Amino acid sequence: MSALYFQNLPSRPANKENYTRLLLKHINPNNKYAINPSLPLPHNKLQISSQPLMLLDDQMGLLEVSISRSSKMTNQAFLTFVTQEEADRFLEKYTTTALKVQGRKVRMGKARTNSLLGLSIEMQKKKGNDETYNLDIKKVLKARKLKRKLRSDDICAKKFRLKRQIRRLKHKLRSRKVEEAEIDRIVKEFETRRLENMKSQQENLKQSQKPLKRAKVSNTMENPPNKVLLIQNLPSGTTEQLLSQILGNEALVEIRLVSVRNLAFVEYETVADATKIKNQLGSTYKLQNNDVTIGFAK
């Protein structure tokens, strides 16, 4: 198993790349991707052939940092290494010397299942022929795709549960020696009732959801550089802590969040510090499906 899990990490920001660099910085302060934020992070594809691997950290043999989308796992991450031996060495090192990220002592251990990338590397080494290997990978991908869909699509999840309930109902009726024609009738009635309930619940949900009015976004393109950034079009519920994780550095002075207008003023020590963050993130930044704009305040 070449994957490890981390627990008790800081709550992750929406930007996975920034989070990855944060972990790299604490794992290895000399990591080139942690030192230079403008250096693009490597992305490894599934090993469907003997293609070269690109490492996040050469010293540790670290390949990938994976983050679950589940809200229950906001303080967790999974790290994939090139080999099981490198994962074991990493685990042994931080068993004797605690790893801390932003002051939090990280708990870690071997993952119960390998990451998809780690699994593909493992299967690539063991594969006897391409056809069998590709079928195995497709099976894993299909299962994980279904799992993601069930988490994100409530209707799909309910229909999936309904199919399972129908299978159990059929099994229960057959164990009671009920005639097949009667089983079909009972199952049909059960399925119809459940589908009607789902449809009714979905319609009620649509009626209760009213579109929120968004505050007008001011044009900051012509504003001269200064040490205060204006962050606009923030998602509802954005917190100062979240903004600090995205926009914070050692030069951060203050974050003034104006929730009713979905914007924030972020002040740094110097104009150069503010400019550096703006250039790093760009004029627009994706946050929870919102195109957040970043510019200099007047």
Curated annotation (Swiss-Prot):
Effect caused by changing G295S: Splicing defects
Domain of life: Eukaryota
Annotated source species: Saccharomyces cerevisiae (strain ATCC 204508 / S288c)
Further remark: Present with 2950 molecules/cell in log phase SD medium.
SUPFAM superfamilies: RNA-binding domain, RBD
Keyword Endoplasmic reticulum: no
Protein name stated in the entry: U1 small nuclear ribonucleoprotein A
GO CC terms, sorted: commitment complex; nucleus; spliceosomal complex; U1 snRNP; U2-type prespliceosome
GN (gene name): MUD1
Subunit-level organization: Component of the spliceosome where it is associated with snRNP U1.
GO molecular function: U1 snRNA binding
Chief location category: nucleus
GO-annotated biological processes: mRNA 5'-splice site recognition; mRNA splicing, via spliceosome
Compartments (UniProt record): Nucleus
Keyword Ribonucleoprotein: yes
Signal peptide coordinates: none
Outcome, altering V228I: Splicing defects
